[in-house]
């Protein structure tokens, strides 16, 4: 039954173009390769035009485990998942319990009220639904998503562009607060891709934490470098 529900939900989302277009995770005809192809082409085009691109590589804290069930159900309903399908998903989420074992002693059994079940086919699709509206918080920057792997980025020509990117980073922090998710500021980083000798520099902040600037960053199996070289891992 889970496979039937998953297929129904995905078909509904895809046929009505409800999923964010730059989300390539767990979707029909999309993959890690399709994400990398379009992203690398975009970055290469900017580099060819000698345009700087600043990337904010985000890091979710326990992304799949933190999704609140009731808020997820509200989002599913908003996207048109209702009636028997919504009832089944509610039962799928709620019929789960947890207990803590310490030194051989077990705590009382408690219901699990957050998290999409991992190791299931439906869980990842539910996660896509939950983070789908993160893109709506962006005003001038682009957002790339592959499940929870996320990058906020923008072409930079002046400090004003940096300020705009910072505003969208602040907006991501508001989304995080609104929907009870969490980013790891100390694990997020900034990669500036440019061939310019004097690039536009900016200290980006998340929760008043200055994000680390790096010269290279791994993304979906490749390493992006600030001078626009990129390498694949050795097989």
Predicted regions and their residues:
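Active-site palm subdomain of RNA-directed nucleic acid polymerases
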Residues: 5-23, 48, 124-153
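Conserved pre-catalytic core of RNA-dependent polymerases
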Residues: 1-117
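Catalytic palm subdomain of template-directed nucleic-acid polymerases
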Residues: 62-79, 150-174
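Short, conserved micro-motifs composed of acidic
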Residues: 167, 182-216
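Hydrophobic alpha-helical membrane-association signature
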Residues: 39, 126-130, 165-168
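Short, charged alpha-helical motifs in flexible N/C-terminal segments and linkers
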Residues: 44-52, 173-192, 218
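Basic, alpha-helical interaction scaffolds
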Residues: 139, 209-235
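Short, conserved catalytic/metal-binding micro-motifs enriched in Asp/Glu and His
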Residues: 5, 59, 76, 89, ...
């Amino acid at each position: 039954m889970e496979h039937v529900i998953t297929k129904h939900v995905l078909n509904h989302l895809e046929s009505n173009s409800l999923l964010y277009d730059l989300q390539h995770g767990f979707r029909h005809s999309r993959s890690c390769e399709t994400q990398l192809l379009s992203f690398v082409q975009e970055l290469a085009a900017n580099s060819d035009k000698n345009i700087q691109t600043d990337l904010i590589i985000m890091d979710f804290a326990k992304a799949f485990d933190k999704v609140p069930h009731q808020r997820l159900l509200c989002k599913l309903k908003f996207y048109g998942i209702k009636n028997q399908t919504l009832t089944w998903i509610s039962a799928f989420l709620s019929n789960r319990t947890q207990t803590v074992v310490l030194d051989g002693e077990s705590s009382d059994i408690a219901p699990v009220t957050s998290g999409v079940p991992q190791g299931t086919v439906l869980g990842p699709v539910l996660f896509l639904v939950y983070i789908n509206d993160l893109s709506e918080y962006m005003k001038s920057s682009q957002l790339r998503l592959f499940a929870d792997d996320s990058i906020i980025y923008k072409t930079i020509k002046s400090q004003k562009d940096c300020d705009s990117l910072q505003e969208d980073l602040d907006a991501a922090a508001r989304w995080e607060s609104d929907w009870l998710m969490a980013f790891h500021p100390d694990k997020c980083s900034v990669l500036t891709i440019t061939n310019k000798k004097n690039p536009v520099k900016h200290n980006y902040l998340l929760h008043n934490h200055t994000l680390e600037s790096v010269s290279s960053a791994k993304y979906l199996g490749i390493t992006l470098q600030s001078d626009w070289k990129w390498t694949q891992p050795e097989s």
